[in-house]
Design a protein with these regions (language model features):
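Short, structured segments at the rim of ligand-binding sites
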Residues: 1-264
Length: 264
């Protein structure tokens, strides 16, 4: 922009790491930009410069493999390798490695250089967490994964910072409540922006079929539940194309049997 730009942010900042990632990437290409205070971002007049740029793999997408490792770990089968991820990633959802560490998943990086893309190994260890408490204000896209995984591992939880989940691709709070109930878990959203599970169960559907609400993350967060519910059906599986179009193919490579409707 010839005259630059000043942005004034209002209200509570949600998903702050995405703003920080954008600023860092702009600076990589020569932008003169400053986050001056909590609510003001200044972009000065400055053309972008051209140079090569490595695009790291998606830590958000890796969350579903962490979930698989955690659920398979109870069968001593949880060993997964992911490629082209950085230990020092600027992606906010790279926090998934810390979240799942309390669920018994050890993350090992093949390279000791924090800014070097490398192979990541996930190894399941014993989990003795009595209750999972976490504020998702900076990583709301990971909430569905942790809700499903925590329930299936029988770990009560209290998750906060979820106020934006109601205005995502769908109302993810209502969607989670409805679909987890099909699997026999009763969630509590009586406090706005929070979701709890205190261990309350109900009778699961005999042959559960998960609705995805045109939401890619509903499909991918619930897919690993087939480890506990063999034959689990996922309706409208094509929704994964928004962020992870090869998700089902990658599950096949990992040994999961995927049967499409046309094959019934």
């Amino acid at each position: 922009m010839k005259k630059g730009l000043i942005l004034h942010l209002t209200g509570n900042i949600i998903s702050r790491p995405y703003i920080e990632l954008t600023i860092c990437t702009m600076k990589e290409f020569g932008a003169d930009i400053d986050w001056m205070d909590e609510s003001t971002i200044m972009v000065k007049p400055q053309p972008y410069s051209k140079h090569s740029f490595f695009v790291e793999n998606d830590w958000s997408a890796s969350s579903y493999w962490y979930e698989i490792a955690a659920l398979m770990g109870e069968k001593n089968e949880g060993h997964i390798r992911l490629t082209n991820l950085m230990e020092g990633s600027r992606q906010g959802d790279s926090a998934i490695k810390f979240m799942f560490s309390v669920l018994g998943i050890k993350t090992s990086f093949a390279s000791s250089e924090r800014q070097k893309p490398t192979t990541v190994s996930l190894n399941a260890q014993r989990c003795t967490l009595p209750t999972f408490n976490f504020d998702f204000i900076n990583q709301p896209d990971l909430a569905q994964t942790l809700v499903v995984c925590s329930c299936l591992k029988d770990i009560p939880f209290h998750f906060r910072g979820l106020q934006t989940l109601r205005i995502k691709e769908t109302d993810r709070i209502e969607a989670l409540k409805a679909e987890m109930k099909k699997l026999g878990y009763v969630l509590d959203d009586s406090i706005e922006g929070e979701l709890r599970w205190d261990g309350t169960r109900c009778e699961p559907d005999e042959s559960p079929a998960i609705d995805t609400y045109e939401d890619h993350r509903m499909a991918m967060a619930f897919a690993p539940a087939c480890i506990k519910f063999p034959g689990l059906r996922i309706n409208n599986p094509e929704v994964v194309s928004k962020s992870y179009p090869l998700f089902w193919e990658d599950l096949k490579k990992a040994g999961f049997e995927i049967i499409h409707n046309a094959d019934y």
